[in-house]
């Protein structure tokens, strides 16, 4: 975990807007997230992925949490199917390129969509007739109020 005080957010948003945050924490693991959860009860905060869907119009007087949780794993299910696990801090476009390099096809229409994997289920990203929901089996998430790991299967995601 990295912590910065009174930091510029210019490099953390794709508009390149100069704004400052009182504090910014980069999290790299679920342990990092668990450590800061108690602060979220009483402090103003926002989570930030790739910074492509945010426009700062003024300084942010609070805690900015930047998701840097990375990891990719591919597990064969059978001869024709593969189960891919990707952590939420992975860059979406880099993930699509990785799947293609592994010989897993289907996501290529969604290449060059900015942001991180963590935003994909929230927005059901899509392009050229292909949507995230077409390939998502489940989403694992942390309930911020309790720190409990929750798993949402495809129907529970309500795409």
Please annotate each region the language model reported:
Residues 1-131, 135, 139, 143-145:
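Anion-binding (especially nucleotide phosphate/pyrophosphate-binding) glycine-rich loop
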Residues 137-159:
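C-terminal substrate-binding/cap subdomain adjacent to the FAD-binding core in PCMH-type
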């Amino acid at each position: 975990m990295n912590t910065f005080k009174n930091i510029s957010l210019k490099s953390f948003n794709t508009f390149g807007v100069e704004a400052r945050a009182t504090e910014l924490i980069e999290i790299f693991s679920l342990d990092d997230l668990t450590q800061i959860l108690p602060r979220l009860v009483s402090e103003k905060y926002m989570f930030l992925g790739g910074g492509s869907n945010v426009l700062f119009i003024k300084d942010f007087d609070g805690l900015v949490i930047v998701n840097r949780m990375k990891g990719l794993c591919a597990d064969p299910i059978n001869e024709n199917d593969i189960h891919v696990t990707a952590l939420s801090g992975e860059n979406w476009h880099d993930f699509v390129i990785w799947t293609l390099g592994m010989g897993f096809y289907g996501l290529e229409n969604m290449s060059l969509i900015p942001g991180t994997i963590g935003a994909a289920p929230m927005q059901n990203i899509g392009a050229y007739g292909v949507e995230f929901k077409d390939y998502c089996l489940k989403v694992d998430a942390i309930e911020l109020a309790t720190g409990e790991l929750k798993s949402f299967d495809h129907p529970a995601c309500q795409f």
